[in-house]
Amino acid sequence: MKKAKLIFKDNTPFSLDFDDFYFNSKDGLNESKFVYTHSFEWKNQENFIIAESGFGIGLNFFLTLKRFLQTTPSKRPKKLFYISIEAFYIEKEQLREIYQKLGFYEEFKELLEQFLKFYPKAKEGIYRFYFEDCFLDLVFEDITILKELDFKADIWYLDGFSPNKNSQMFDENLIFEVARLSKKNTQICTFSSASFLQKNLKKYGFRVEKTKGFRKREMIKAYLENELEFKDKEAYFSRTFSSLKNKKVAIIGAGISSAVLAYELSLRGFEIDVFEKHLELGKGASGNESGILSSLILKPKVNLGEFSELSFIEASRFYRQILDLEFKGVVEFAHNDLMQERFDTQRENVLFKISKNQAFLEEGGVIFPKNLVKNLFEKSKACIYFNHEFQAYKFENECFTLKFKNDIVKSDYAVLIYAMGADTKDFVFYDEMKLSKVRGQVTHLKPFLNTPFPLSSKAYICPVKDDLQVIGASYDRLDASLESKEEDDKQNIENIAEFIDKNTKLEIIGSKVGFRSYSSDRFMIVGNAYDEVFYKEEYKALLWTKNKEQKLAKISCNLYFNFAHGSRGFSTSVLAARYLCALINNEPLYLEKKYIHAIHPARFLIRKLKKGL
């Protein structure tokens, strides 16, 4: 990612990249209020979306958030979503210094320091920050990323530098995407009154009004007169906006994917019931004593690798923001030539500090799954029903009725979510969706290695906790045994041989078996259940029509999937939960389209139809 080159000129941040000031050098604070943050009225609605081209130093955001928080809750939206695109990275300490030099620091200190505490490294991606009733999605990408996003803004801040020095931020391509991501009466706020900007806005259906500017002759405001329709060549992956009879949600399964999802749903005011077949938490793969938070390390530009990196860093930021966890890092080792080749190609990646055959991931570390899952459920205030083994559902009158073993029935749920990990294989029967149930066994040893962070190679070693050290894990697609096996413990020990002296005697004090859920392409499966009959009929000619407009997919009910997280559920569950909440609650979709397509439940069928099979 590009680093911003800036200096102070006339006591104001000045960009050397664009030869322009970041904002008005005489009164930037009041100009931002006049042009952007105080130029519209709040609407008392569920979700209010502000999108911004050019985050800069974040002044517009902090002014907007401050105004939002100071407004009486009954006179503002329930949730504020603020989406801001920024292509030029400013270092954390430099941001703080800018606010101090401008004399803004004390005014924004609390919000700014909360922001800086979780400020990410200089790497492209979408990074979510949690504030009171507000989500900030800071998008570190070029402005062309808009074509990958999906939301309908209420307000646009068209910021950026002067149009004659940064024309890309105001050109026709940008305004096309702005129009696509707007709805009827969406308001455009901008300091500019450039004629070519007015022309582009009018071309895509905006009514343009000239108005008095801040200490100058004029500026413009614009309003979208009618929501535009655009051709969608991949409508089979596009969202269908949900309509809910109530805010009751049922989640089947009580592992990590369920716990994160329950927490995220609780932030949106949903009533959550979780059903678990076991008598307590932690009986499945999410119940290990210790585990590691880490990332796959693949070659650059590999979709699975990039998704794993984003999942990892956002999970780390989530656990730090929500549970106040601290991570000391994790060390990954290249234990064969292929892995070493991957490590060698990632030396410029800021997530990985690579030296020879080692990669240190500063944001990773040891996790304690049982405690983590328990704490998230407690924060969510979800009601957990143990000893409830799910059998079937019935959907009628826009609600689900659930049947459990022993003739237990629960009803009146507007949303049903499958999050039962490896057991999902017994309830999802699409022809093209191939799921694997993979057995894994971890071994509990008496402490034998003093390490402050996990070590991961052929197997992993966790730091000592409560006089116990966890190593693992085995991997077996063919074994369905629930019982621990001596040969698996032996294999786990053999796989950590590189870390211990050959004369070291290890004492096994226990082990635990769990089952992972995998898809055939290693991406998680997250999104709406789909109507297989409709897909096969409507998209049967995709081999010949894949470059033409497609009909929007039919969704028969609010059944959602959240499974196939493999061995990295503590990373991927965070992105999954945010994406599902966006679908259920009609929010900005949060993920880029390339990732939405990669995790979509219908992707296997669509690939087959595109081949004419």
Swiss-Prot record:
Ranges where the record places region tRNA (mnm(5)s(2)U34)-methyltransferase: 1-225
GO molecular function ontology, one term from the record: tRNA (5-methylaminomethyl-2-thiouridylate)(34)-methyltransferase activity
Pfam families, per the entry: DAO, Methyltransf_30
Any single Gene Ontology cellular-component annotation: cytoplasm
Signal peptide positions (record): none
Subcellular location, record wording: Cytoplasm
HAMAP family documented for this protein: MnmC
Family of this protein: In the N-terminal section; belongs to the methyltransferase superfamily. tRNA (mnm(5)s(2)U34)-methyltransferase family. In the C-terminal section; belongs to the DAO family.
Protein task: Catalyzes the last two steps in the biosynthesis of 5-methylaminomethyl-2-thiouridine (mnm(5)s(2)U) at the wobble position (U34) in tRNA. Catalyzes the FAD-dependent demodification of cmnm(5)s(2)U34 to nm(5)s(2)U34, followed by the transfer of a methyl group from S-adenosyl-L-methionine to nm(5)s(2)U34, to form mnm(5)s(2)U34.
Protein name: tRNA 5-methylaminomethyl-2-thiouridine biosynthesis bifunctional protein MnmC
Organism field: Campylobacter jejuni subsp. jejuni serotype O:6 (strain 81116 / NCTC 11828)
Lineage: Bacteria, Pseudomonadati, Campylobacterota, Epsilonproteobacteria, Campylobacterales
